[in-house]
Structure formats: structure tokens, C-alpha cells
């Protein structure tokens, strides 16, 4: 168990002092620092090694979301408290980055239990609820790279969390081109260093995209390098990424081969992408049968319809009846906005955030984030 400094950010003085009295004599607590000024608290927290934060959200105020977003980039060891413990409040707490939620008045035994649990998590294992979200289609030309790039960018904006965008289309990846990046390292380089236990390569090997908390890992520089990557190395890569990034968005090839199956098997969610035409739907049907044969959980595979038009002859209900699955999301057809974004090497929201497709990707990312939180919220319900 690692010793920690506990930072209590709470507008209520009495509440701050009670929490301090509960925990100041615990063996693993170096110091308890109290703040009613959340901004000043954040400035001290980011200078601390292995901090634990107790953040009260009983009073909503301007800047709370911004402070919480910054805190998530410093530590995942965040406890959120509130006098309101409705389901909506718990969901909000988790969205703000809570590892645990405690209703007020906080009970000493609950607080000590949660602090003990967080103190026992080493920094390299902090991100325990990380999700691998793979965008996949078994047919080329469907637009999965566009979806992966823009979903990852919007997740970084919506959640304020660190998001990894990983190009595992090992022979013909395009993510770096889509975002006009020229990373000094690639996935082949990172995998080789991970084999040698150089886990500090994870951040160094990624290219940060502009001012977002989005980190890009490009495909191998040379096609022949892809041939030496093994399924075990994919497992090693994912295991390492999950220690650093709460969200990992993966783009991959359309192939069905051992590497592809390892990526799909290891993913928490698969954004299975298709378009509205008969050949694409038939291919989707075959692929879904493969997923069923591999015993994927029912909530693992999400159907995403790309280039959707309201006046399509084939309706969403027809697709759902054919595939035997509900459609999770529809991305509208907007060829010119997409091509402008690709040609400029930027995300769609940078071209036209208020276009139909810009709004769609923002709402898509919000839904993904909210649904992941919803999966976790049951354990926090009072």
C-alpha cells in the first residue's frame, strides 16, 4: 500500500473538518489538505505524487466540470461526495471521473474502506476501468477510419480523459494521414520496447493531437514490419495501454485473420460498421454470425450505420430485422464535410462542428461515454 496525500475539495468547512478527523491518523495517509477554493486545490494536487482527491459536488458552480476534467488528467484516484445521491447524481459523479461515490453524511467506515482500496492501487495500475473500443467492418470502403478518428477526438472533448487512438490496420493504416501527423514512433516500435519492459514508451511513442487529450499511435512505417507482429504482442500492447488510457479507440483492417481475431476478442466494445446496401448488409450478417460463434456477449457488438440517409429505400427496421440486432448509432451522409476534413488533416468538428455529421459524432461520443458509465453505475446505487 502506497502512502498518499489526501486533498479534500469541499465548500462546507464543517464537512472538510469531519473528513479530516476520520482519516488523518491512517497509516497510509501522509497529510490531509483542505480546500474551499477548488482551483487552488487543483494547482497543489498536480504538484503532488500519488494524490487521492475527495471532491464534493453538493453545490454546482461554474467551473466544476473544468476542474474535474483537469483532475482526471492528474489522477484517477478521485472520490466524489454529495448530499444528493440520486441515480443522476451518481452518473454525473462517474462522468466527472469518480473512482468511488459516497453519499453525505459520509460514514467513517465507508471512507476508510474506499481510501484503503485506492491507496493499494499502484500508479501504473490506476486505470482499471479502461475500455477498448474497436471500430470494425469486414468490408472495405465503409468509412471505419473516419469513424475511429472522429469518435476518438470527440471522446477526448466530451470526457476530458486521455484517449488513445491506435492504428492496428497494420499494413495500410491511414490515421496519421487523416490527422496530418508524422509521429516519430509507430506501433511496431512501441511493441518492441514493451517486450523489453520499457513501459515508459507508452506516452513517448504516441503523438498528441493538438490541444486535445488525444494520443495517436500510428501503423508500422513499413508493410513488412507488420508481418512480424504476433497475437501475444497485441495482448501485451492492450494490457499496457489499459494501465494508462481510460479510452482506447482502435482502427483495424477488414481482414479475418489471427491478428484481427485477437484484436476483436480483446475488445470491450466492437463498433461494427456497415452501410445501407444489400451487399454490405449480407456481409454484416456473415460477420455477426462469426461473432456469435465466438460467444461474444450481447452488449459487446454495437451496430453503426455509416452514410445514413433518411430517404434510403432500405429502412433501419429492415436492417435490424435482417441482422437480428438493434442499430446503436446512425452517422449521416455528408461527403463534402468528410472530404474537407480528410484533405485538411483535421477532425470533422474542426471543419464544421455544427454540421449534421459534426453534431452526430459529438452525440455519438457522449452516448458511448454515458453508456460505459451506465454499466458501472449499478455498483454505486444506494
What are these regions (language model features)?
Residues 106-114:
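C-terminal output helix
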Amino acid at each position: 500500500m502506497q502512502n498518499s496525500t489526501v486533498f479534500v475539495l469541499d465548500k462546507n468547512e464543517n464537512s472538510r473538518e469531519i473528513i479530516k478527523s476520520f482519516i488523518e491518523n491512517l497509516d497510509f495517509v501522509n497529510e490531509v489538505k483542505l480546500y474551499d477554493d477548488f482551483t487552488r486545490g487543483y494547482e497543489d494536487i498536480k504538484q503532488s505524487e500519488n494524490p487521492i482527491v475527495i471532491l464534493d459536488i453538493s453545490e454546482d458552480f461554474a467551473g466544476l466540470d473544468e476542474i474535474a476534467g483537469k483532475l482526471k488528467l492528474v489522477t484517477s484516484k478521485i472520490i466524489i461526495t454529495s448530499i444528493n445521491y440520486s441515480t443522476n447524481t451518481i452518473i454525473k459523479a462517474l462522468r466527472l471521473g469518480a473512482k468511488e461515490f459516497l453519499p453525505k453524511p459520509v460514514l467513517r467506515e465507508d471512507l476508510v474502506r474506499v481510501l484503503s482500496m485506492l491507496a493499494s492501487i499502484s500508479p501504473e495500475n490506476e486505470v482499471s476501468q479502461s475500455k477498448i473500443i474497436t471500430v470494425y467492418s469486414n468490408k472495405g470502403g465503409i468509412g471505419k477510419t473516419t469513424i475511429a478518428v472522429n469518435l476518438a477526438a470527440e471522446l477526448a472533448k466530451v470526457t476530458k480523459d486521455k484517449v488513445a487512438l491506435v492504428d492496428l490496420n497494420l499494413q495500410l493504416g491511414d490515421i496519421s494521414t487523416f490527422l496530418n501527423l508524422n509521429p516519430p514512433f509507430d506501433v511496431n516500435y512501441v511493441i518492441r520496447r514493451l517486450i523489453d519492459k520499457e513501459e515508459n514508451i507508452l506516452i513517448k511513442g504516441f503523438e498528441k493531437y493538438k490541444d486535445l487529450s488525444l494520443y495517436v499511435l500510428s501503423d508500422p512505417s513499413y508493410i513488412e514490419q507488420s508481418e512480424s507482429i504476433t497475437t501475444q504482442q497485441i495482448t501485451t500492447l492492450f494490457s499496457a495501454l489499459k494501465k494508462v488510457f481510460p479510452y482506447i479507440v482502435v482502427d483495424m483492417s477488414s481482414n479475418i485473420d489471427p491478428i484481427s481475431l485477437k484484436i476483436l476478442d480483446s475488445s470491450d466494445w466492437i463498433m461494427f460498421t456497415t452501410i445501407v446496401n444489400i451487399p454490405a448488409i449480407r456481409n454484416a450478417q456473415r460477420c455477426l454470425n462469426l461473432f456469435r460463434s465466438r460467444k461474444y456477449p450481447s452488449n459487446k457488438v454495437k451496430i453503426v450505420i455509416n452514410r445514413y440517409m433518411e430517404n434510403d429505400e432500405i429502412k433501419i427496421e429492415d436492417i435490424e430485422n435482417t441482422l437480428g440486432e438493434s442499430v446503436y448509432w446512425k452517422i449521416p451522409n455528408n461527403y463534402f464535410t468528410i472530404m474537407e476534413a480528410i484533405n485538411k488533416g483535421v477532425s470533422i468538428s474542426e471543419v464544421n462542428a455544427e454540421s449534421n455529421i459534426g453534431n452526430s459524432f459529438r452525440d455519438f461520443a457522449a452516448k458511448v461515454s454515458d453508456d460505459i458509465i451506465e454499466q458501472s453505475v449499478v455498483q454505486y446505487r444506494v
